[in-house]
């Protein structure tokens, strides 16, 4: 049995294959997943697992250098936005690097997901609970 944090085989495999600047999406239950993208569906029921639960586990194994977030989260989900920014700040400190945060419209965000290595769907049912993580290097 794997001893590391990520026990889900699909998520572990995707993270291990990421190269510098490759992207990985963690999303809520409602984000449309492009047909061209690998879909890893973690949703069990509404809210389970939450967006933050999935993100926290993914970022224990993924080196992140940038994040893309929909601008709309600021006004439509300010509590999650604050939680997300706190997590990214803590991740920066843990990794010892600066994580660039980019905001874009939700429409452009959805288009950008087509270029990601995979889309990991959580059971989150709150608006704009989505992030595109850009892989960094550990050296």
Swiss-Prot record:
Keyword line: Carbohydrate metabolism, Cytoplasm, Isomerase
Major subcellular site: cytoplasm
UniProt EC number: 5.4.99.62
Location(s), subcellular: Cytoplasm
Superkingdom assignment: Bacteria
GO biological process: D-ribose catabolic process
Residues binding substrate, per UniProt: 28, 106, 128-130
Catalytic site: 20 (proton donor)
Keyword Isomerase attached: yes
Protein task: Catalyzes the interconversion of beta-pyran and beta-furan forms of D-ribose.
Assembly and interaction partners: Homodecamer.
Protein name: D-ribose pyranase
Native organism taxonomy: Bacteria, Pseudomonadati, Pseudomonadota, Gammaproteobacteria, Enterobacterales
């Amino acid at each position: 049995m794997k001893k590391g944090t990520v026990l889900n085989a699909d998520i572990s495999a995707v993270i291990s294959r990421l190269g510098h600047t490759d992207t990985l999406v963690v999303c809520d239950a409602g984000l449309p997943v492009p047909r061209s993208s690998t879909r890893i569906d973690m949703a069990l029921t509404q809210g389970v697992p939450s967006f933050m639960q999935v993100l926290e586990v993914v970022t224990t194994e993924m080196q992140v250098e940038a994040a893309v977030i929909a601008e709309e989260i600021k006004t439509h989900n300010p509590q999650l936005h604050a939680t997300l920014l706190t997590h990214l700040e803590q991740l920066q400190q843990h990794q010892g690097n600066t994580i660039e945060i980019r905001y874009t419209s939700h429409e452009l965000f959805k288009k950008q997901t087509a270029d990601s290595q995979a889309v990991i769907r959580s059971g989150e049912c709150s608006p704009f609970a989505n992030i595109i993580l850009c892989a960094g290097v550990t050296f």
